[in-house]
């Protein structure tokens, strides 16, 4: 256990760097879209196909990665994911034609589905009482990666061209693969769970299909899987279409527009940290605490975002404040849901459980912008935002209620089963 304590912060730092640079690589294609379209002389529909390919491949492979992470060495698989990221991004950089580019960009989705293993490994390095904060810190890589990707695309893209930007981020993936192999070590699954944390040596539990199928018998998990589909709609619709909404329907431009985007992204990052910390604190007081906090944050965020949409174009300051604060509260959900899934899932199937959640959320993430575009075609983006936010919340709340009603007993059941194994090690 002493070795785990000594190494865990180094492991977290390396995995955070992996997540940060990987998210930057995933998100910088947005700012580089125009340059890529000009290079291959393609239209928006063709570019959309290139973007959708990676999402589709990643979604299909979530269960595969989850299974592999539960069966084999997690650090080696994460290093493999980093190497795949580097290689596929490099191939994208040297694509001679549009067809080749679509294929290579789709292949970048292979490594996008590797995050369940990252969270599973960290769950075995850090105690349950601080899992929310650890997950929140790792998820901070998403908004920071967005900023880093935009910065790289703006600074390097204009000077070096989009191909060299991809070469740079591809090389980063290969370097990260080496760092992961050097600094990250696997630990026994369940090493930090109550009843096991004081043991020096633990024989890891083995994956079994019976245990994996048992995930669907936990009411809390099923409810969290279902809510994950609806919960991602509002934040992904707003994130995907916010720039165009601000530019076209509200008439904002230049530095002010970029300022709103930056503040919103930073608010998301801050909300992740506060939500994770408060969720951990309440979880120690009451097993339902983290979930209560996540639900409250989502509801507050929804109300504030809708209020922002009803502000006048001239009241830009109030609009900016409401969007930023709404994003802050909406971010409370993510680390708490992830921590709850980890607390309920047995260690030997934790990656599989997280992969199921990721698959469902990815499906919602892919559909949300399309639904918004279809609604906007009949009215406008503002109306589409309001309809999607309200409908998603109405569908999400019952799932939240079911999870809230069962989370305490499900966590206690998992802990009891783990304690019953203690005498066997």
Description of each model-found segment:
Residues 291-336:
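C-terminal transmembrane helical hairpin of 12-TM major facilitator-type secondary transporters
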Residues 52-65, 262-275:
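Central cavity-lining transmembrane alpha-helices of secondary-active solute carriers
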Residues 104-143:
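Cytoplasmic helix-loop-helix junction between adjacent transmembrane helices
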Residues 76-90, 290-305:
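Structural signature of the two symmetry-related core transmembrane helices
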Residues 60-98:
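Conserved MFS/SLC helix-loop-helix module at the cytosolic interface between two early adjacent transmembrane helices
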Residues 185-210, 410-420:
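Flexible cytoplasmic inter-helical loops of multi-pass small-molecule transporters
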Residues 29-30, 219-273, 334, 338:
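Extracytoplasmic gate region of multi-pass secondary transporters
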Residues 138-186:
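Helix-loop-helix hairpin linking two adjacent transmembrane segments in secondary transporters
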């Amino acid at each position: 256990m002493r070795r785990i304590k000594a190494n865990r912060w180094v492991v977290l730092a390396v995995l955070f760097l992996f997540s940060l640079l990987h998210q930057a690589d995933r998100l910088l294609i947005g700012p580089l879209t125009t340059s890529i379209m000009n290079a291959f002389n393609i239209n928006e529909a063709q570019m959309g196909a290139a973007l959708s390919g990676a999402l589709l491949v990643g979604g299909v492979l979530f269960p595969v990665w989850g299974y592999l992470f539960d069966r084999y060495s997690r650090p080696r698989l994460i290093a493999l994911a980093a190497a795949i990221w580097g290689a596929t991004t490099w191939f994208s950089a040297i694509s001679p034609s549009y067809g080749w580019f679509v294929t290579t960009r789709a292949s970048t989705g292979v490594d996008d589905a590797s995050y369940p293993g990252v969270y599973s490994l960290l769950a075995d390095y850090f105690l349950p009482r601080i899992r929310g904060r650890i997950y929140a810190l790792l998820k901070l890589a998403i908004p920071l990666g967005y900023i880093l990707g935009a910065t790289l695309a703006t600074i390097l893209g204009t000077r070096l061209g989009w191909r060299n930007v991809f070469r740079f981020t591809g090389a980063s993936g290969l370097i990260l693969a080496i760092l992961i192999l050097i600094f990250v070590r696997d630990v026994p699954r369940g090493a930090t769970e109550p009843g096991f944390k004081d043991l020096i040596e633990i024989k890891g539990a083995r994956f079994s299909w019976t245990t994996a199928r048992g995930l669907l018998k936990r009411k809390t998990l099923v409810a969290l899987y279902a809510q994950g589909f609806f919960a991602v709609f509002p934040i992904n619709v707003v994130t995907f279409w916010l720039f165009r909404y601000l530019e076209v329907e509200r008439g904002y431009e230049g530095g002010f527009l970029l300022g709103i985007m930056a503040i919103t992204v930073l608010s998301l990052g801050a909300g992740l940290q506060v939500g994770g910390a408060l969720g951990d604190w309440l979880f120690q007081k009451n097993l339902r605490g983290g979930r209560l906090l996540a639900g409250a944050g989502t509801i507050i965020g929804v109300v504030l975002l809708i209020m922002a949409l009803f502000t006048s174009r001239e009241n830009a300051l109030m609009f900016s404040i409401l969007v930023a604060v709404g994003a802050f509260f909406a971010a409370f959900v993510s680390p708490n849901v992830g921590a709850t899934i980890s607390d309920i899932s047995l260690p030997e199937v934790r990656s599989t459980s997280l992969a199921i959640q990721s698959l469902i959320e990815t499906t919602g993430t892919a559909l949300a912008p399309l639904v918004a575009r279809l609604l906007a075609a009949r009215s406008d983006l503002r109306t589409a935002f309001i309809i999607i936010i309200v409908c998603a919340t109405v569908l999400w709340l019952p799932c939240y209620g079911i999870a809230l009603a069962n989370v305490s007993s499900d966590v206690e059941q998992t802990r009891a089963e783990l304690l019953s194994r203690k005498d066997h090690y």
